[in-house]
Design a protein with these regions (language model features):
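Extreme N-terminal tail/first-helix region
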Residues: 1-21, 132
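Short, P/G- and charge-enriched loop/turn segments at secondary-structure junctions
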Residues: 8-10, 25-26, 106-109
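Short, flexible segments with low predicted structural confidence
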Residues: 11, 33-34, 67-68
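Short secondary-structure boundary/capping segments
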Residues: 11-12, 38, 110-112
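Short beta-strand segments
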Residues: 17-52, 60, 80
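Short, structured beta-strand-loop surface elements
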Residues: 52-126
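Short helix-loop capping/hinge motifs at secondary-structure junctions, enriched
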Residues: 127-131
């Protein structure tokens, strides 16, 4: 599939939102229950992590299907869910600390090796590929 790009407006809106709601696709095309998670922007990319590590239910479902529906900052999009490249990890850690540093009890687990291993990149699906 050819991925679309986030618009500057989408990046700004999602990147500045405190939470993103993610609903992983389950069983092919059924969108599951949405859950609130943290999201960070690094350059032109959006990243998410599982606070519970690889055992998080939303993480397992999103990683298995590689697809989800997200909503944050007034933006709703169907997305591809890809494993982030290891080289992005330090920048993603820094983005979590900068954005969520006011929650030190929660941000430290988000930059731990357990959560870091669950870093996913969100790629918007082209409009013609959006769910019907």
């Amino acid at each position: 599939m050819t991925a679309a790009c986030w618009t500057s407006e989408e990046l700004d809106q999602i990147g500045s939102a405190d939470e993103l709601r993610i609903a992983p696709v389950r069983g092919g095309r059924t969108v599951g229950r949405s859950v609130p998670i943290w999201v960070v922007r690094v350059g032109e990319n959006l990243y998410i992590r599982s606070w519970r590590g690889a055992s998080g239910a939303w993480f397992r479902a999103a990683r298995a299907s590689r697809a989800a529906h997200v909503c944050a900052g007034g933006v709703e999009r169907d997305v591809e869910v890809l494993d982030a490249e290891e080289r992005a990890s330090d920048a993603v850690d820094a983005a979590y600390r900068q954005k969520y540093g006011r929650y030190p009890t929660y941000v430290e687990p988000m930059v731990s090796p357990v959560a870091r291993a669950t870093t996913l990149r969100l790629i918007p699906r082209p409009p013609h590929a959006q769910r019907a």
